[in-house]
């Protein structure tokens, strides 16, 4: 089973970073108001990036690192092409 870290852009322009084993299911939870407290009332969302990891520990470590980055650093990270984060994906979601 893969473990994912993702970044959502909320309708107010803020970014939310989270962890899940099923990105689609988790975004639906956020959209229904049953996701993280932070995202309630901030939809619709746009999925900005996802990273896949083989273990929960690795994913949780990465989530912690990303959550502690400034917005500018997150934007730089998401815009990277190649390198260790080449599996970053950009998708639109409502």
From Swiss-Prot:
Location of the GIY-YIG domain: 1-76
Pfam (any one): GIY-YIG
Database matches in SUPFAM superfamilies: GIY-YIG endonuclease (SSF82771)
Highest taxon above the source species: Bacteria
Entry similarity comment: Belongs to the UPF0213 family.
Protein name: UPF0213 protein BH0048
Organism: Halalkalibacterium halodurans (strain ATCC BAA-125 / DSM 18197 / FERM 7344 / JCM 9153 / C-125)
């Amino acid at each position: 089973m893969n473990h994912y870290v993702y970044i959502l852009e909320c309708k107010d322009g803020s970014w939310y970073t989270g962890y899940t084993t099923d990105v689609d299911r988790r975004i639906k939870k956020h959209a229904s108001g049953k996701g993280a407290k932070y995202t309630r009332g901030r939809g619709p969302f746009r999925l900005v990036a996802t990273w896949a990891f083989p273990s929960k520990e690795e994913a949780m470590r990465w989530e912690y690192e990303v959550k502690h980055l400034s917005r500018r650093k997150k934007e730089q990270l998401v815009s990277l092409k190649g390198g260790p984060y080449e599996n970053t994906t950009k998708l639109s979601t409502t």
